[in-house]
Amino acid sequence: MENRRAFIKKMGWATGSLSLLGTTSLLGWQNPVLWRKPTRVKGKVASNKKGLPKVAVSDGETVILTDKNGNFDFWSSSQQPFVFVSLPAGYQIDQLANGSASFFKPLDLKSPSNEILFQLKPVQQRDDKHSLLILADPQIQNEYEVEQLLSISTPDFIQTIKELNDPNTFGVGCGDLVYDQLQLFDDYNQSIKATNIPFFQVVGNHDMDYLDSRTDQVSTRTFNNHFGPSYYSFNRGEIHYIVLDDVFFTGVKREYIGYITENQLAWLEEDLSYIEAGRTVILCAHIPIFHVKNKAHLYELLSPFKTHILSGHTHRINHYFEENCHEHVLGAVCGAWWSGPICVDGTPNGYGVYQVNGSDLSWYYKSVGKDKSHQFRFYERGIHPEFPNSCSLNIWNWDSKWSVCWYENGERKSHVRRVNATDPLSTKLHMGNKLPERRPWAEPAVTDHMFFFEPSDVSNITIEVTDSFGNTFVETVSPNK
């Protein structure tokens, strides 16, 4: 505890003065209105005083390309009171004062016209190679959890960024940045500011104005005040990035469903019309698209592209495949809601690290407080109550391109069984109505990344796990006799 507090003091943070009485509004956001007079939006996208042609600009409804001089001019009746530039490849991601990406301007809805200037700066190093951190579910609710985020998780983010050594690194907060306490956005912002990289933000179900909203349309007011639009796009190198809001508030207490509104689908259809078929698209959302009610319509829009979907929400890792879409459901920064070191499926508290080279993408899951090589957990025979005669492995980021083998006294054995089962450590920490102490409602979850095998009674075992990219992780163990 003293070391953590020393780190916080060093970084100039003070969790003892949480922003419990208010939240810092950056934008002066106005409530959307269903019917209003159109506003003329005109302006320029420029760099070094020179207009940039063919750059997409949008109000969340209309998508228009700048002309040869970088100018744009359109009438907006969008319900989203922002205009944003779909940042083109080769230009820096500027930051707001709170550390988030700056790519938008608020619109004055009472004015008959708005003049907008987007000034972009070229990157210092080509961004066809770039890296990103995906932070799903930091989900801070109180002072203790803020301290955990700032003193344990954030130093890990910083160290990973240092090791990446990539000037084009950026981050994505993949929703549930806080846990209903929206005033803690300021404390979340302290974490991302400390990383010194720009962060794009995704709205999660716990980031919404549930208590004083009657429809989904106005349920992201506070989020918008801090971070801007809740859906948008941008480009890095050869990759087109999309952020969607797939949390639909029903207007009943905290009730929501996974659903993408027609406004977003119509906007996305127009946005993607300017993207060449066959390109790689990375889409970020909070609720896994696999669980979204109208996902088929989204898959149809994405069908011309090679798509990776990055999501969170479930506090466990899953990989889903739908035609040309690979969805990566990430483990939570907060694990099982800051109750201990792991998520409900046994995945360590952590985040995703993605590296892009041209149109190719590689990734790994980074466990907080562990080396990047920490990719599985071994359990001796007799530990798993359902399989008492087996040794078991939890390989949390496993997908079908991974391989697993083991050596018994130097002899290679390749037979392992993948079984839907719970993780023994999760069972120990989470099972029952009194565990975990901080969140007794958190229960161990059945997962599809548990593996089982049966060694001889007396053996020395080496486990060898290889990921999708040929990286091999080895551990030698001596199981019970």
Residue positions per predicted region:
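N-terminal active-site segment of His-dependent metallophosphoesterases
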Residues: 33-42, 47-48, 93-186, 457-459
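N-terminal secretory signal peptides and thylakoid transit peptides that target proteins
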Residues: 1-18
